[in-house]
Amino acid sequence: MVSATAATVASVSPTVTALLAAIPSPAQGVWMLGPIPIRAYALCIITGIIVAVVWGERRFIARGGEEGVVTDVAVWAVPFGLVGGRAYHVATDWRTYFGPGREPIEALYIWQGGLGIWGAVALGAVGAWIACRRRGVPLPFFADAVAPGIVVAQGIGRLGNWFNQELYGAPTTLPWGLEIYERVDPSTGLPDPLTGVALDDTPIAVVQPTFLYELLWNFAVAGLVVWADRRFRLGHGRAFALYVAGYCAGRFWIELLRTDPATRVFGDIRINAVVSVVVFVLAALYVAFGKRGREVLEPSDEVSSEPGEKGAGETSRDESGGDEHGDRTVASSDPRPPAADSDRDSPLR
């Protein structure tokens, strides 16, 4: 995929160098530590995961959860998410790996890039559900706590596309266009878009920096979720649904700007644009019609790590005092958060 897009932009006129301003790409995305490759793509993903876990832990505790639960759930959710993300990418871009002249084994080469967020969230949620059951925590309560951190992690992960010089848009004359350089193997001088080094800082193209658009959009969505969560006391999975809806709205228009090869449906529409619309509608409906109020966890007298045991984990109720599953549940009518909690879930403190 990377080599194909590099070949496409190589044909662009060199007059792009006359632009007054542009965003430079890194000269390389891989560094060798002896025989071990250090990949910027992986470092960005790891950094995003750390941010999501740390911020999610703080929000989870601020909402009444037990310390350490988010880290425990991440041990399950992250591997499931990586597998799901890769599986979705391969399933929707199977022509890259299967067919005449292709190498099916490369479907496992996750370090070359290629993770589909839809598969990552879906299978990651399965891993989170398993871990939440083991800890006795309702999955919607957990999801609401970690939602802003997840979308920030996605934004940080987009920096990996910047280092890899991939998934960008069409050539542009905008002053914030992204410069694309030809990368080569220093030892042979042959083109090597993925692991090579740019020996010349003359761009072969200046393109739409879709990685940057999505990064900024994701950060804005995180801010929206935090604000709405404080203002409306979102619970029962509605904060997570708001994140999903917000992300899909941005992914739709950004997807239309991208020029990398993609599976197309309904004529000439990129499949991820279609998925964005479908998921947006479902998430928006849940935000609009989902259960109001915010549940509160109450630790039981005995806490067990095994699911199904008496006293295991924590029980939840609405802030109004009713049991979550009882007939007396009444959602809180006051949308304003208590003053003491107003800043407890902020990542900057």
Regions found by a protein language model. Give the residues of each.
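A feature for loop-to-transmembrane-helix boundaries and adjacent hydrophobic helices
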Residues: 1-349
